[in-house]
């Protein structure tokens, strides 16, 4: 793919929005064929996978791929033979490298690892710029919010897990490393900090745009209602979790601003942007989303899928082509009242619970992604589920990785959790190992990593 700067990427996004449906479909096919051709010529893995692929192939002719297989073949998967997973993992061993460019060429990002070992991904500068172009062109559902953001100093602060090479964290850190003068306009607060520290940072920074996980922002709304948090954002953008109608209204009423969300993932960046009708419109000039059932068969519009197959049309260094993502969506092609002709999806998001502990007669609430971010660092854990019960009793359901001792894994996870809770002022906690493995809800079929078992 030709080198593309962020301005050109923005122009390409705007140009696409003016195309007819026929032109859009043709562009998507061209980009898919160019990507597949490049992957066959530069990736040993794809060269073998596509060895019998006809020249006039369609999207459905391409075999599906998945994280486990691609990670097992990482060195052959990428299209730059100088890239080696061992070198990238060594680079990731230094947290100072978050947001830095590996070999001065690639930003390194990783998934959260909710379904086993995390994916390690690399983005060249063109891929970074296209992600930035999509964000700059389509992030704001309402033009007046963008204007208000610009008018109020363009100051942004996000609250999320900042200790890893995650997409949001790495992207912000990268911008701050390359443009250090942006520090007065862009900030990050860790979701792992005690709430009073986050509140102080936000009060000092006074962001015009506030971002973060819905569950954490809900706790910040309570801080504002109690008079401790005093900020006036013009827009709130959430991500990483499902944004319920109740939380959306609570945030809007508390901060007196518009609240919106988006659908992003490590493999595809901003997959879909929310419109004023709260529909997630797919950025289908750069990404292809296929809803499928458990066996990989197409799911019709209006039906909840078991997963999706995602094709990223702009990452040439590490092609994600019909890549399995375990998010469940409902696809729509009917017209949306906002005027955006791109298909839109309903997304079944994460539904983990806010929990609460009591220390010295004080109730301390904890956002679920804070607990999740701590425990995913225990690499011997394949899956986990934390049940928070009354009297600060925590039941931990775990599934350890192959060749790892179950009791040792639990002790590591328990220590990580207790150390984190201590930073929140919670020291009286009893963590026990459950005989039960992590499991879905017997009725809804939904899986929660963090489950509240008490009334709060």
Residues of each region from the PLM?
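AMP-binding/adenylate-forming catalytic core of the ANL superfamily
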Residues: 210, 314-317, 321-424
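Short, hinge-like loop/turn segments at secondary-structure boundaries
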Residues: 175, 228-229, 277-281
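Conserved AMP-binding/adenylate-forming
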Residues: 234, 243-335
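AMP-binding/adenylate-forming
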Residues: 126-135, 155-216
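Residue-level signal for inorganic ion chemistry
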Residues: 39, 111, 156, 210, ...
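Nucleotide 5′-phosphate-binding alpha/beta core
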Residues: 1-110, 117-137, 144-151, 204-211, ...
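Adenylate-forming
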Residues: 190-193, 197, 207-248, 260-267
């Amino acid at each position: 793919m030709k080198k593309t700067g962020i301005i050109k990427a923005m122009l390409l996004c705007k140009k696409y929005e003016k195309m007819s449906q026929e032109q859009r479909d043709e562009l998507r096919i061209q980009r898919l064929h160019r990507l597949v051709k490049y992957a066959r010529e530069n990736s040993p893995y794809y060269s073998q996978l596509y060895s019998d692929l006809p020249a006039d192939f369609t999207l459905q002719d391409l075999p599906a791929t998945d994280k486990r297989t691609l990670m097992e073949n990482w060195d052959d998967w990428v299209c730059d033979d100088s890239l080696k997973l061992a070198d990238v993992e060594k680079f990731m061993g230094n947290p100072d490298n978050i947001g830095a460019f590996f070999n001065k060429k690639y930003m390194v990002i990783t998934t959260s690892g909710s379904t086993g070992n995390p994916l390690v991904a690399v983005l060249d500068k063109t891929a970074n710029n296209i992600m930035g172009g999509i964000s700059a062109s389509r992030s704001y559902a309402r033009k007046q919010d963008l204007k208000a953001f610009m008018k109020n100093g363009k100051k942004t602060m996000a609250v999320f897990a900042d200790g890893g090479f995650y997409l949001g964290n790495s992207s912000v850190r990268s911008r701050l490393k390359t443009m250090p003068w942006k520090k007065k306009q862009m900030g990050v607060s860790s979701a792992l900090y005690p709430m009073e520290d986050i509140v102080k940072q936000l009060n000092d920074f006074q962001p015009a745009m506030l971002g973060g996980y819905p569950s954490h922002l809900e706790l910040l709304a309570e801080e504002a209602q109690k008079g401790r948090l005093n900020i006036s954002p013009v827009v709130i953008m959430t991500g990483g979790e499902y944004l319920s109608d109740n939380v959306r209204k609570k945030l809007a009423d508390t901060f007196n601003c518009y609240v919106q969300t988006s659908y992003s993932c490590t493999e595809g960046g901003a997959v879909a942007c929310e419109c004023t009708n709260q529909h997630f419109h797919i950025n289908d000039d750069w990404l292809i989303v296929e809803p499928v059932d458990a066996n990989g068969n197409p799911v019709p519009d209006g039906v909840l899928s078991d997963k999706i197959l995602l094709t990223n049309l702009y990452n040439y260094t590490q092609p994600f082509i019909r890549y399995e993502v375990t998010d469940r969506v409902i696809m729509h092609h009917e017209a949306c009242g906002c005027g955006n002709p791109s298909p839109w999806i309903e997304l079944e998001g994460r539904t983990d619970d806010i929990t609460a502990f009591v220390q010295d007669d004080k109730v301390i609430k904890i956002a679920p992604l804070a607990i999740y971010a701590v425990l995913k660092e225990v690499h011997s854990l394949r899956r986990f589920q934390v049940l928070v019960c009354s009297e600060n009793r925590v039941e931990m359901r775990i599934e350890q990785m192959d060749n790892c001792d179950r009791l040792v894994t639990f002790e590591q996870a328990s220590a990580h959790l207790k150390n984190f809770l201590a930073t929140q002022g919670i020291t009286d906690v009893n963590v026990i190992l459950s005989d039960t493995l992590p499991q879905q809800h017997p009725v809804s079929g939904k899986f929660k990593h963090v489950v509240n078992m008490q009334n709060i």
